[in-house]
Amino acid sequence: MTDTTLPPPPPPPPPPADKMPPPPPTDVPPPPPPQEEELGPVLVPSKKAKKGWASQRKQPPSIDDILKAKREQEAAAAKPKFLSKAERERIALEKRRKEVEEAQRRREGSNSSTNGASHKGHYDASSSIPTGPRAMRPEAPSGPPSRQQRSNGDMAPPPLPDKKTGKRPPPEDAEAAMIRQRYMGAEQNQSTFSAKKKRKRTTEKKFNFEWNEEEDTSYDYNPIYQQKAEAGFFGRGRLGGFTEDVTEQGTQKFIEAMIERDPVSGRERAERILDMERRRKEEGGRAQLDKHWSEKKLEHMRERDWRIFKEDFNIATKGGAIPNPMRNWQESGLPDKVLRLVEHVGYAEPSAVQRAAIPIALQCRDLIGVAVTGSGKTASFVLPLLVYISQLPPLGPSNRADGPYAIVLAPTRELAQQIEVETRKFAAPLGFNTAVIVGGHSIEEQAFQMRDGAEIVIATPGRLVDCIERRMLVLSQCTYVIMDEADRMIDMGFEEPVNKILDALPVTNEKPDSDAAEDPNAMKRGMYRQTMMYTATMPTAVERIARKYLRRPAIVTIGNVGEAVETVEQRVEHIQGEEKRKKRLQEILNSGEFTPPIIVFVNIKRNCDAIARDIKNMGFSSVTLHGSKTQEQREAALAQLREHRVDVLVATDLAGRGIDITDVSLVVNFNMATSIESYTHRIGRTGRAGKSGVAITFWGNEDADVLYDLKQMLTKSQISKVPEDLRKHEAAQQKGGRNKEKKALT
């Protein structure tokens, strides 16, 4: 085991400047070297006898000794050596002290090198006397400092202190900081930002945009600024220089002169000129700007008028070159026979979605209609559909087996039957057959109804897929596809059947995915397949279907997506318990404020029969509608309500979407819906076709998940108010309600 050896101590520093001899003068020759000292390297020792000359010469160590010593050193180094904490600190401080001294020595050497060769020559001259010829001596220092040294014999002045090192901390602090950095690591959050450098950097590149008035020299030499020309006007004045009064005076003088020259033909020409002048005044100028869009002719409508028109009906469109909406049925572009049917059915004014969607559909463009419930979407796709298939050859024995020309997909049986009733009003007078394919009926019976062929088939996705898989129906010549309530179909799990139906369509008449799909002339010449999708919301699955099967569609948005129509007044009441809600329902029905038909919604279908019995005990007739009813029972219940044979319909969310019952004055949510979308479609059963309605909702603490959305919907409505108990409820303050509280506890 060998002890740790310390390195030899550093050489002593050079003697101070005050004890050094002055340099030799340059005018005195150097003394000759001693005779006994040779100038070259001494190779032969002197003949003089030295002490210990007769002793035995020390022999060098052998190889075995060297190897043995090396093995001993390696063995000792391999053995662990215990060092106490004090020894380790002492070794580290000693090592650090040497590093600091070495760094200080290097800095002093670099500082001394800045003075040139004067210091070097001075130290060399003071340390030893030259012993060789002049050529072997160090060079004499030159420059101004050397001349001062020769004159007064002093050293060169010390170098000027560096500005950067002028405020250097003392060595003890620097040493402590370096030791701290070595053992604890560098500081991670230490900022290297320099405010002085940043300020300097920004002020150098800052451009001054201000200018003074005395810098403007245009007044000195440009006469335009000193002699401004005044425009001369006639009469009251106008930008063109003439007013209407002056123009009328000139026209009147011209007409009088014309009549005097030729009383017969001049008077006729004067009448034509006056008529032209009158029309010019009516059609142009300020008078047209002041007119409302309803008072203008179609050719006089400007871009500003169309913008105001869209704002009035809350219409938003996007998707390329989209035609302007129609203001009335006469400007729709529909054939005369279809317009006569519209008038016969009783559609006086088109709804907002009909104004925007029909002109686009007549150009054979694919369409996505995002409209609130109860906005009249059925007629917006039925009328363009009839115009399209009227251009196709009629069905006969040769093409009857190739399937229908158009299919309409609906999520529920009730909605499909309702669409079939509305479609038959327009299709039957034009000679087109319609067929409905829904569940609840015998599939063989429905196939027998289609034995003569049908141009239009309205179906639910599940039953239509069954017919296609059983080879009872083919879609070989289907050229028109409509998906009504597409988001509802996706929610009910019909995404896969919808994809199967759309994949079964022929690809020969599919539109190209290019700019030609937006050209109405090209689409009409080719008679390509046209696809229309109507929805109230746009979930991801609906967007996925639209991207796959629609080509450059035009998107029409009516109102705000997910909001109720403005014709429905929403009232909400905080009532806990079934019995209290039944008493409040009896008060509402007995108030006489609302006339039948009335719809009451509940969340659980077993409550339908119980609530219906209670309503009968109150003195009102009622029927029920829920998922456990057969198709015949559903149709009978809706027929009784439409024919006003019963007063109240008690239903679940099955009837909350797509069921069109006219003149529903009141909707009561006996149980608050589980989602705000279901609530929107429930209250959409009233206030349809531009009529007003009322929706009353009972809510409790169990509905905390939807209270925030309910409060937001009431806030956006202009005819509804938010009650204080709902406004201050804890669950209505943030989205999520009770779910966020549960997540916070877990």
Swiss-Prot record:
GO CC terms: catalytic step 2 spliceosome; cytoplasm
Top-level taxon of origin: Eukaryota
Residues of the Helicase ATP-binding domain: 358-556
Annotated ranges, domain Helicase C-terminal: 567-730
One of the GO biological process terms: mRNA splicing, via spliceosome
Biased composition (Pro residues): 1-34
Residue positions of motif DEAD box: 484-487
Pfam families referenced in this protein's UniProt entry, alphabetically: DDX23 (PF25430), DEAD (PF00270), Helicase_C (PF00271)
Protein name: Pre-mRNA-splicing ATP-dependent RNA helicase PRP28
Organism of provenance: Phaeosphaeria nodorum (strain SN15 / ATCC MYA-4574 / FGSC 10173) (Glume blotch fungus)
Gene: PRP28
